[in-house]
Amino acid sequence: MKLFEKRIAYKPFEYPEYYTEGWLKQAQAFWLHTEIPMSGDVKDWNENLTPAEKHVVGNILLGFAQTECAVSDYWTGMVTKWFPKYEIIQMAMLFGAQETVHATAYSYLNDTLGLTDYEGFMHEPAIASRIDALTEVRSDYDHEQLAKSSTARRDVGKSLAIFSAFTEGVALYSSFAVLYSFQLNNKLKGIGQQMKWSVRDEALHSKMGCQLFRHMCDEYPELKADAKTAIIEAAKLTLDMELNFIDKIFEKGDLENLTAYDLKHFMHKRINEKLKELGYEPHFAYDVSASSRLDWFEHLASGVEHADFFSIRPTSYSKANEGEDWSDIF
């Protein structure tokens, strides 16, 4: 089997895990923003959030829609061109489509809460660097060039690893954690539920993209060493951007149930985990005690059956299997 050799027939699948673990799980978890009531969040925004809390939430939400547009384009425009296997193509197309659901949902949250200054937000240095990083990690080879050229495979491998591990697996996680933490105080339930579904989507996308990189390394063993330096440098850059972003959103102080210090060390831990998922050793030291105070978020990202910490009924990865009536929750 070779990842870059075009197969005419739809089946048999040569890489069935991208159907069963990628496409199928995403299809089972499909959701829309219209499923989530927001009236309670509007009341919280107008009556129950402090100025510091509103500053944090507003800064995060304004950046979400823009970043998701870049992510969607990568799956549908790049991955489908590189890997001419239907099981991978249909997974990438569905992942890209789900990112448009995220972008629409985040825009809906912004509109609902009256957050409309997208242009001003994009001029913030901490935000602009995030957007730039998302759009720069790409490569314009096609599958025929990848089959023949080790240079092409190195460039695409680096791009795929950086995108999957750090863009999908790290870059928005500090924001997800902050927004979901409000449910500790029974606030912003609609936003919290959207974060829950978004995190599970992004965790799946990151997992499958990292797996695709490892498949490349299995078939072309020289790739892992060739790409290592660039991937470690990208990890450092991603972490620096996240730490700067955390400073920006916490510039008016910590939240009641979440500190900037704890979140920063959780992000160190998170990026180490993604390096391991790519097949590399952890690279960053961190305060284990501080990162452990966000263990509740690890459960959210895992996508496995668990009892939710914030009075939401037990869930599994598949939203369709949750059997929940959201009107009961809200």
Tell where the protein language model's regions lie, with residue ranges.
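Non-heme di-metal
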Residues: M1-F330
